[in-house]
Amino acid sequence: MCEALTYAKAEGLDGNTLLGAVSTGAAGSKQLDFQGKKILTGDFAPGFFMKHFVKDMRLAEEEAENAGLDLNVLQQALSNCQSLIDRGCGDLGNQALIKFYEK
């Protein structure tokens, strides 16, 4: 969602139009509806803190390693979110991931 909204903005597309187009199809979800609107309005109030999201991803990464799995997408998401915590975004909601792309 964050990548799609970043792309839309870079191409001069309206984020609300994008969300409306994808939300009614297979890509739609409650998370998209809820977090997408918050991102577009700049509402980063936490429903779930970024710092807790990273903690949970670290637990998942540890369990994956214990199982002998290499979960590249998890590792990339964890790295991206950790960089936001390093920038002081740990107390924001996980929708603040958009800030990673707004560097």
Report the location of each language-model feature.
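Structural helix-adjacent loops and short alpha-helical linkers that scaffold large soluble proteins
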Residues: 9-16, 68, 72-73
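Beta-strand segments within the central parallel beta-sheet cores of soluble alpha/beta enzyme folds
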Residues: 14-24, 75-79
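Interdomain hinge/lid region at the active-site interface
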Residues: 28-89, 93, 100-103
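Short, exposed beta-strand "edge-strand" segments with a Pro/Gly-rich flavor and a Y/T-containing core
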Residues: 7-13, 87-92
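Active-site-proximal catalytic alpha-helix in oxidoreductases
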Residues: 1-11, 22-34, 52-54
